[in-house]
Amino acid sequence: MAVKRHTAKPEAETSANESKLASFCGWEGDTLILNVLGTPGAKKTVIGKPKGNQLKISVTASPENGKATDYMVKFLAGEFGVTTKDITVVFGQFNIHKQLRIKAPKKLPSVIAKQLAEQN
């Protein structure tokens, strides 16, 4: 059975690559858009709970020159069953507020699968 995917509609003030979502995640074709609230320098690297329109993700890497974001992308690549090249940081490379585009994820972490199921 095919997965039903909704297209997020960018609003006027968003750039060509930036999407506004009703929740922390949504589909644009086969690409998953994910709004993230990152926590660098954490004790454990984990996908946390939603906080507003962002998903909390903690990483152990320090917040120096985008290292925490790079580490987060590597971690999420494993969680979604994709390569790091399949994940694009739309904005927030050097900030805790990020938007990621994950092309054709092969698996979904439970918190994301639950949110997407509720959107359908």
Briefly describe each language-model feature range.
Residues 1-74, 82-84, 88-94, 99-120:
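Contiguous, often N-terminal, cationic amphipathic patches that form binding interfaces
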